[in-house]
From Swiss-Prot:
The gene is Dusp26. This is Dual specificity protein phosphatase 26. The active site is at C152 (phosphocysteine intermediate). It is an enzyme of class 3 (hydrolase). One of its GO terms (cellular component) is Golgi apparatus. The lineage of its organism: Eukaryota, Metazoa, Chordata, Craniata, Vertebrata.
């Protein structure tokens, strides 16, 4: 299993950091429905973190967060037996590097591969990959029997950010709606830089709908 204790410890650390950086307290328990601010047109980063710290915080090596869309970690990406059992046809690796992830790793499985060389840093511009990743996910799920694993090292930040962007771009979810949908199935915690980029996407998409 994805180490739930590790994820909770990370959330607790970030919550403490947020409290020292903002007057708004970070809530680490409760249900998503208890969040009074989720109906606000746009949340700020600290409010989004409060939302992320509520509800489900555990995760497996991979969790189906949308029909046919699995969000997971590097261990699942390396497990050919599990990929075959789940019927995975596509893999999107958000932590691609020279040493981690190649199309050749899936030779004989009939899996199509896309690598995104992203760093889990607030300074990294993930937004340049939003559309390409969303298009790849959409193509995977549009084919008969298509199933996709979107992963990074742990499956909670880089890959989660790309999944959220996909739901926003192709299914017209707001960012809050996308977070709640994914968190119904898996704990996630995109870094603050990624949250700001998703907020910018949220504003752009909603302004386009209102135009």
């Amino acid at each position: 299993m994805c180490p739930g204790n590790w994820l909770w410890a990370s959330m607790t650390f970030m919550a403490r950091f947020s409290r020292s950086s903002s007057r708004s307290p970070v809530r680490t328990r409760g249900s998503l429905e208890e969040m009074p601010s989720v109906h606000h047109p746009f949340l700020n980063v600290f409010e989004l973190e409060r939302l992320l710290y509520t509800g489900k915080t555990a995760c497996n090596h991979a969790d189906e967060v949308w029909p046919g869309l699995y969000l997971g970690d590097q261990d699942m990406a390396n497990n050919r037996r599990e990929l075959r059992r789940l019927g995975i046809t596509h893999v999107l690796n958000a932590s691609h590097s020279r040493w981690r992830g190649t199309p050749e790793a899936y030779e004989g499985l009939g899996i199509r591969y896309l690598g995104v060389e992203a760093h889990d840093s607030p300074a990294f511009d993930m937004s340049v990959h939003f559309q390409t990743a969303a298009d790849f996910i959409h193509r995977a799920l549009s084919q008969p029997g298509g199933k996709i694993l979107v992963h990074c090292a742990v499956g909670v930040s880089r890959s989660a950010t790309l999944v959220l962007a996909y739901l926003m771009l192709y299914h017209h979810f707001t960012l809050v709606e996308a977070i709640k949908k994914v968190k119904d199935h898996r704990g996630i915690i995109p870094n603050r830089g990624f949250l700001r980029q998703l907020l910018a996407l949220d504003r752009r998409l909603r302004q386009g709908l209102e135009a």
